Amino acid sequence: MHKIIIDTDPGVDDAIAILLALAAKDEIEVVGITTVNGNVGLHYTTPNACKILTLAGRTDIPVYSGCAKPLEREPLSAEEVHGNDGLGGIGFPDVEKQPEEEFAVDFLVRKARELKGELVLVPIGPLTNLAKAIEKDPEFVNNVKEIVMMGGAEFKGNVTPTAEFNFWVDPEAAKIVFDAGFKKITMVGLDAIDNARMNPALRELLYQIDTPVSKFIYDITRVYVNESWRTEKDLGCRLCDVLAVSQLLDPSVCKVVDAYVDIETKGLCEGTSVVYRKGRYAHVQKVNCQVATYCDTKKFVEVMFGRMFPEYVEVAVQNA
């Protein structure tokens, strides 16, 4: 049983990733959700986390509001991808659930102490909260069991030719995290995510399943598909953050390589994750993470539908 904190900026794909983690209740215990500025501002990401938990019937899980801006930069966002509110602009109603009073960074530090050696962090937004936790508590790094994150890219970015959005929003925070010395980091970046797709057939299947959760996913991904069509003439969409949770559930979903990852914080390529693969570069001796390089699409779909809509997993895999 993985005891996890999801650090997130919901976000269309964040919402689906959270719902997947909640559906895998025999494998994952979500001990809390921390929010951060990213896809949209904190004034949306925190209520969005509360809305997702309400939809899933899991209002018992606490939400903690985190950093409203990057460490050293002004906030950036991606409303064109996620809608003006982060949840596809579908007008999801307000809910009664509210965030806790405790600051997300303090919660991260406290929970890592309480669950020393057990806690898995799943950051699927900018890494500002984690960087702050590292700065706050020298033992935080040692207390965390592992990190499975969505972020970065070895070869090609999505907001610049070289940078992925989460690292680009707060490169200083990403550098702090990769330099900190965590026991295990798995970086699920854009190289693997190319195959973590929801094609039109899978999206139609969600509509036909016709549950509140499946219809919610169908509705919020409309804006995702619109952006994919506008930029790539693709009628599907990549489920970036969902792949990180899938990889936690089944490490065979992605191929990974050992590497040393550094983050560029200045200049033309700021936000770029520079990946030195072990064995490719003779001078590289130190390894600080595993980098996902490829995703098996059918395995990804099997993990996602197998946990969320198990009675439809066979037809989903057939249409992947």
Give the label of every model feature segment.
Residues 1, 20-29, 168-170, 185-320:
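Conformational coupling and interaction surfaces
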Residues 2-8, 12-51, 85, 91-195, ...:
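Active-site histidine-anchored catalytic micro-motif
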Residues 40-44, 48, 71-72, 153-156, ...:
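Short, mixed-charge aromatic SLiMs
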Residues 46-114, 287-296, 300, 305-309, ...:
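Metal-dependent C-N hydrolase catalytic cores
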Residues 56-57, 137, 249:
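A broad structural signal for alpha-helix termini and local helix breaks/kinks
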Residues 63, 177, 245:
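A residue-level signal for conserved active-site and pocket-lining positions in enzyme catalytic cores
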Residues 68, 78, 84, 127, ...:
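Generic secondary-structure boundary/loop-capping signal
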